[in-house]
Amino acid sequence: MELSKASIENIFNKNEKEYYIGLICKSKYDGEEINEPLDLSIALDISGSMNCPINMMTDGKSRIELAKNALNKLILNIKKDDKIALNIFNDESKTIFPLSNKESIFNNLEIIKNIKANGGTNLTNALNNAIENIIESKNKNKRIILITDMLDNNPDINLSNLVKKCVNELNIYITIVSIGSESNTSLADYICKEKGCNYFNAIEDTDLEYFLVKNLRYITFPLSFDFRIEIEKNDNFNIEEIIGIKKEDNQYYINQNAPPLNNNIPPPIINDNNNINEIIFEENSIFPSELTIKNGEIYQKGGLILIKIKLVNENIKPDINLKMFYTDIDGEKYNQNYSINLNDISNNLNYFSNENISTGISLYYYGFILKDFYKNKKDNIEKSKYIEKVDVCKNFMNKYYKTYDDKNEIKNKYLKDLNDCCNFYDKPIQ
């Protein structure tokens, strides 16, 4: 885990000082493809709604065409020891080919090309069929991938039990790659509460290929389970807020000297219950992250956790002690201790120990402004007062938002969102 810290003036109240701790989880497998053999059972949604474009507001390629293209590239890029089974589903489910190696699957590429979409959606049938196609596999790395727009309006009550059985009894993990912004994310969130399962939402034409081809080996191999971070309670500070910055389009600089997960592992713990600690973050499963090298620096794709600290007395700067717990894939439990001190930043205004935390705080204020849009309109706050807040936030982002993006396309998108809030402030809420 990598720690960073910051002290800033509240951008809306210069008399108020804020302290932040930033956390980024890292592992020794980040940026490295795991080359163990992988058995995949893929279920492809061919319901009628898959004929729609991925974004209902555009006239781009249909979801089914994008899915088939990504599936073809996935097959062409798998390792020689990997195996894939494919079933298609609408109201019913049908196996296109059983668990097969790369060479055998090539004979079925033309069949995939000719798949058409029609009918309704039954995810329970799809999952049942996907399980049947992989249940006899002896490989320890077994995963089902559901490629679907998740528009199952009448999900079977047995689906939740089937998911639990798949993961906990059969040791088969599930990945959902949903297509479109109107997907049933509540169902996906439920499935992802099971260990080893994860969920990705494709809302752009390039997303399916990104998840299923470029990042296949990052999203299919869990590193650890029951991951949590605790902070030691202290009378000298209070936790004001915990902010999870999980923007898919953000990457954060990695300090190569920071100790990664599963490196220099401490001995297994006997009892990890400690009532003097407060849980600040929990994740059912941890997966490796993609790394990007830009101008000689290494950036990690993934999320930043911000802890907003309120000091009881500005003259007392306590150590902030944290503890990380996790269970490895073999069931062994581990913990690691971390500590960070605020003394060296107490007299500095707008101090950031690295660009990760300045970017994270920028996004925190950006999110605050977007949420404030509706609240201000509801409370009939004058537009001029709202615009003042937006301008302050834009100035902060322009100065402190840093990413690997040379063209600043991501930052410019956020700034455009803020401008749109001002432009649409006078219009009624739909």
Residue spans for each PLM region:
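A broadly tuned preference for mixed-charge, low-complexity surface segments
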Residues: 73, 134-145, 194-199, 231, ...
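Acidic, polar loop-rich interaction surfaces within structured domains
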Residues: 136, 140, 157-173, 179-329
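Exposed acidic/Ser/Thr-rich ligand/metal-binding surfaces
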Residues: 5-228, 312-314, 416-430
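Intrinsically disordered, low-complexity coil segments
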Residues: 8-12, 52-60, 235-237, 294-298, ...
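Surface-exposed loop/edge segments in extracytoplasmic proteins
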Residues: 95, 238-239, 332-336
